């Protein structure tokens, strides 16, 4: 609550929360047990528990403003996209999807809408190493994407604005895919 209070003092009433934090590590699941467990705990802690913790911290201001929560999920909330060694990331993003839907059901009675965006391959620092070191994986992904390209961070802006605005006043518990059509085929 102290964080929410501090933010409220700086920016005024909080009515929109975007949970956009995530990490991934590509260590082999079959590798060193201690490293695998550490990676699992770190990824789940940031990607899933972080969404829970921040949302919980801002719950009262969001209820007071009948606010909107936009969680950043992933294409991997739905499918495994042939990226190696990603069970923790995939699991964390499945969790964000489940959390989004469950929270939408629970907070709807307070007028709070909870939705998510499911980005496909977006050119961000999170996947820079994969893009640089595994062009064959990027090609497989892009070849499966009807728009034929990776997304840019600005490709997420439109869905985020829509979900945070009154244009989506009757939308809750939904996932807006921003994946270039990856899931369409």
PLM region descriptions:
Residues 60, 105-109, 169:
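Alpha-helical segment proximal to the catalytic Tyr-Lys
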Residues 12, 108, 113, 171-173:
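Short, small/polar-rich loop/turn modules that mediate ligand/substrate recognition or access, typified
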Residues 70-95, 100-109, 122:
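Catalytic loop of short-chain dehydrogenase/reductase
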Residues 26, 30, 83-85, 109, ...:
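A glycine/serine/threonine-rich, flexible loop-to-helix segment
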Residues 55-56, 101:
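A short, exposed helix-loop element centered on a Lys and neighboring polar residues
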Residues 24, 160-161, 172-185:
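Short C-terminal tail/terminal secondary-structure segment
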Residues 28-44, 141:
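Substrate-binding pocket helix/loop in short-chain dehydrogenase/reductase
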């Amino acid at each position: 609550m102290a964080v929410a209070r501090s933010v409220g003092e700086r920016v005024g009433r909080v009515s929109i929360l975007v949970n956009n934090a995530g990490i991934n590590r590509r260590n082999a699941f079959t590798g060193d047990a201690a490293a695998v467990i550490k990676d699992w705990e770190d990824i789940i802690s940031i990607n899933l528990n972080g969404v829970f913790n921040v949302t919980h911290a801002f719950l009262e201001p969001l209820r007071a403003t009948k606010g909107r929560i936009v969680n950043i999920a992933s294409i991997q909330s739905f499918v495994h996209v042939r990226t190696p060694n990603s069970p923790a990331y995939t699991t964390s993003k499945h969790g964000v999807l489940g959390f989004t839907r469950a929270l939408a059901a629970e907070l709807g009675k307070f007028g709070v809408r909870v939705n998510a965006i499911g980005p496909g391959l977006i050119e961000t620092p999170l996947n820079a190493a994969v893009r640089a070191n595994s062009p064959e994986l990027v090609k497989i992904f892009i070849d499966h994407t009807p728009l034929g390209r990776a997304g840019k961070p600005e490709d997420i802006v439109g869905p985020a604005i829509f979900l945070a605005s009154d244009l989506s006043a009757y939308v809750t518990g939904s996932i807006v895919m921003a994946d270039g059509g990856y899931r369409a085929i």
